[in-house]
């Protein structure tokens, strides 16, 4: 399943790359977290965006959700992922892939609890013009 998600993300990214020559830059997603748009293409009412996200040791994404589905591949490091119940819903090591569903009912947090940068390749499939993420309040967890 993980290989299938990675193949889908890579295939979609290659298709998007073939369809566009523009390269956009993104701003950091939060304290210590950086993001760089590698490829962006709009088809119909959807934006397909391939982005590299780097999370330094001890940092995280902050609580958030997405307006569209995301497919991520862990290029480096280990990502610890938590849902709104404060439970870990996955620990993703280098070479792993994950899917994040859309909607405010899927609030989550990604953290780097390791000693090296986490580097993700993320394919965002968003409604046209939607932001990468929507900030959400801490759902009552003892960590941020």
Predicted regions and their residues:
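Histidine-centered active-site/metal-ligand motif
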Residues: 64-66, 81, 106-108
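Short acidic-glycine-tyrosine-enriched beta hairpin
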Residues: 43-45, 55-57, 79, 83-105
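Short, low-complexity, Pro/Ser/Thr/Gly-rich segments in the mature regions of secreted, periplasmic
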Residues: 134-144
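Ligand-binding loop in jelly-roll beta-barrel domains
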Residues: 104-131
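Secretory targeting and sorting signals
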Residues: 1-26
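Extracellular/periplasmic catalytic domains that process cell-envelope and extracellular macromolecules
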Residues: 65, 73, 90, 112-117
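Short, conserved beta-strand element in jelly-roll/cupin
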Residues: 67-81
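A short glycine-rich, His/Asp/Glu-containing loop-to-beta-strand
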Residues: 30-62, 123
